[in-house]
Amino acid sequence: MNNKIPPPIVTLFFGLCIFFSKSYFPIYKSDILNTMGLVSFLIGISILISAVRSFKKQDTTVNPINIEKASSLVVTGIFQYSRNPMYLGMVFILLALTLIFNLIGGILFTILFMLYISVFQIKPEEIVMDKLFGEEFASYKKSVRKWL
């Protein structure tokens, strides 16, 4: 796969963009937004942990840079609901930052993150998965959505 930037680094970059661009957008602060942000963060972490456990249970690689080393197609657990729960978890974490620090800018940067990950991570991963798992992956793609 051509992509060499690990998705957690991409998430960190967009998270920093959300935080440091807050002075360019109107400020919306409230206890409700902070609480929703905390809930979003906990959901994101839970999704990530669940996805990693599913990978480990199938004894396959978690490393998105070396997707070619995948030894099995994970379709159980949280992967029944999303083909990309790791990236979905990262979106929830960015939404947490959005709700807590920068509502308008955060929404923009979270959308940009989703576009970036879709084009530069998910699309190349799915090409590799097609080659590795053929019809099994094609069937999985038909039955489970990309994000949620």
Where is each model-derived feature located?
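Membrane-anchoring alpha-helices and their flanking helix-loop junctions
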Residues: 1-76, 88-148
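Generic transmembrane alpha-helix motif of multi-pass integral membrane proteins
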Residues: 78-81
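Extended, alpha-helix-rich binding/interface surfaces that flank or overlap catalytic cores
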Residues: 84
